[in-house]
Amino acid sequence: MIVSIVDYGSGNVRSLINAVRYLGFETQWIRNPHDIEKAECLIFPGVGNFGFVCDSLAKQGFLEPLRRYALSGKPFMAVCVGIQALFEGSVEAPHSKGLGVFPGLVQRFDNDDKTVPHIGWNSCAVRSDTSKEFFGMRPHDKFYFVHSYMIPEKGLILPPEFKIATTKYGNETFVGAIVKNNFLATQFHPEKSGSAGLRCLKAFLTGNYEQPISGEASKLIENSFGGLTKRIIACLDVRSNDAGDLVVTKGDQYDVREKSSGSEVRNLGKPVELCQRYFQEGADEVVFLNITSFRNCPMADAPMLQVLEKAAQTVFVPLTVGGGIRDVSDPDGTFHPAVEVAGIYFRSGADKVSIGSDAVYAAEKYYENGKKLSGKTAIETISKAYGNQAVVISVDPKRQYVKVPEDTKHHVVKTSRLGPNGEAYCWYQCTVKGGREYRDIDVVELTRACEAMGAGEVLLNCMDQDGSNAGYDIELVRLVKNSVNIPVIASSGAGIPQHFEEVFKETDCDAALAAGIFHRQTCRIEDVKEYLAIHDVLVRT
């Protein structure tokens, strides 16, 4: 069977194609309305925002043919924004028309009791019948979600032949999937949901709609907040060594060279091989940080694109890439806006892009302009095209001590780690260019500005803790977590499993990232998750 995939110019569809091919099926693109009518099995991927997706479909004449196909009884699957597009419209794009397969309007999550976007691994189950798996979806499984808009379960009425699998996030219950024979629409990304997602995708492709289950597989794992787990993220700091090879390295307070006389770049292995290992060991996400990219033009950064392409062929969890996501000009003067640069990374297999120095410069201009949005920053243009969940800001702050809060205009915390002269307060100064240049902006100002511009997540590093194995900077993570309404990833300093428990329980951050300890296997991902599960932290196992 050949699987036809709708092509409307969206972001990372490569991973979906890779997953289908990994399972042994051929793929082909749908590029015109006639291709839809001829398809024997069709997948409608959803990457981007509702308006971009539905307007692109309308422009290409796909709306009505796709609607007819969805109702035809032939194998049909929709993913993420794809399930939203099956409804009449969305508050995300009030002037854009959906397919209208189902009645209703897509809504935005409220952030009264939670961060938005909803990012991470959550449950998805037909709660009225947990003794069965539908298209391989088991109540015990966790699937990867990344979205700010959803279809509320409350008030939803579908034809009786359809079953609804729901997901809980804070005070809201929404549609995680809609199923019937030969029909599967998921809010989660099966191609990014590890073995559970591959099982779901395979069940759809083989027509395995319904199977009885029992025991652990039938048990929902949730807490009072829902089924969303804390994420454990592995980070690969990638750069060229002195021989020109792309290697994974690790810094000690941002210094990546050995202390020996040769001072060579610290080499911890090949990026693709390590990425594959982390996937097999249970990493919930993998981050590639191209830490020397500010010295090069990313449009010509072929090795990094090749790493992404190869990793995405066999790694079925989210991949984030950072470094060089900005407006650039080629040596011949050809200009490439940041959204175009991001698009190249997405089409190579990235799910999210991480913006570092450019986020700081954009935040400075945001305040200079009286907190007015320009609409031209990398954060704004990328989030508009691909959704704010596709944009991560990577923050590199360093502690600056003061005797009393009045000694600075910046946001301070009372600290238990006294300064060199006994100072009891500090603020966190943001840096650019890999920590080599300091700017007059603090971490609260930066993250709030970036949230306003459309960033969907904060990757919070700490120059003081980097490579220390002494634990995360709890005061820093708590400060930022309490300052924004988007997810926060704690980074820098993890050395033992207890450090992960500490940062989750004391700050309620959404994810924790580590690099060196996973590279060297002084602490394994499995060890961290086993420890957290024993200590009542909900994780994907």
From Swiss-Prot:
Q: Which residues form the active site?
A: C80, H189, E191, D237, D396
Give the Glutamine amidotransferase type-1 domain ranges: 2-214
What keywords would UniProt list here? Amino-acid biosynthesis, Glutamine amidotransferase, Histidine biosynthesis, Hydrolase, Lyase, Multifunctional enzyme
Pathways involved: Amino-acid biosynthesis; L-histidine biosynthesis; L-histidine from 5-phospho-alpha-D-ribose 1-diphosphate: step 5/9
Q: Please give the family membership noted in the entry.
A: In the C-terminal section; belongs to the HisA/HisF family.
What name goes with this protein? Imidazole glycerol phosphate synthase hisHF
Q: Give the function comment from the record.
A: IGPS catalyzes the conversion of PRFAR and glutamine to IGP, AICAR and glutamate. The glutaminase domain produces the ammonia necessary for the cyclase domain to produce IGP and AICAR from PRFAR. The ammonia is channeled to the active site of the cyclase domain.
Q: Which reaction does it catalyse?
A: 5-[(5-phospho-1-deoxy-D-ribulos-1-ylimino)methylamino]-1-(5-phospho-beta-D-ribosyl)imidazole-4-carboxamide + L-glutamine = D-erythro-1-(imidazol-4-yl)glycerol 3-phosphate + 5-amino-1-(5-phospho-beta-D-ribosyl)imidazole-4-carboxamide + L-glutamate + H(+); L-glutamine + H2O = L-glutamate + NH4(+)
Give a Gene Ontology cellular component term annotated to this protein: nucleus
Q: What is its EC number?
A: 4.3.2.10, 3.5.1.2
Question: What would be an example GO MF term here?
Answer: glutaminase activity
Q: Which organism is it from?
A: Schizosaccharomyces pombe (strain 972 / ATCC 24843) (Fission yeast)
Concerning PANTHER family, the annotation shows: IMIDAZOLE GLYCEROL PHOSPHATE SYNTHASE HISHF, IMIDAZOLE GLYCEROL PHOSPHATE SYNTHASE SUBUNIT HISF/H IGP SYNTHASE SUBUNIT HISF/H
Annotated region Cyclase: the residues are 228-541
Q: Which gene encodes it?
A: his4
Pfam families attached to this UniProt entry: GATase, His_biosynth
GO annotation, biological process: L-histidine biosynthetic process
The keyword Amino-acid biosynthesis belongs to this UniProt entry's keyword annotation: yes
Q: Which InterPro entries match?
A: Aldolase_TIM, Class_I_gatase-like, GATASE, His_biosynth, HisF, IGPS_HisA/HisF, IGPS_HisHF, Imidazole-glycPsynth_HisH
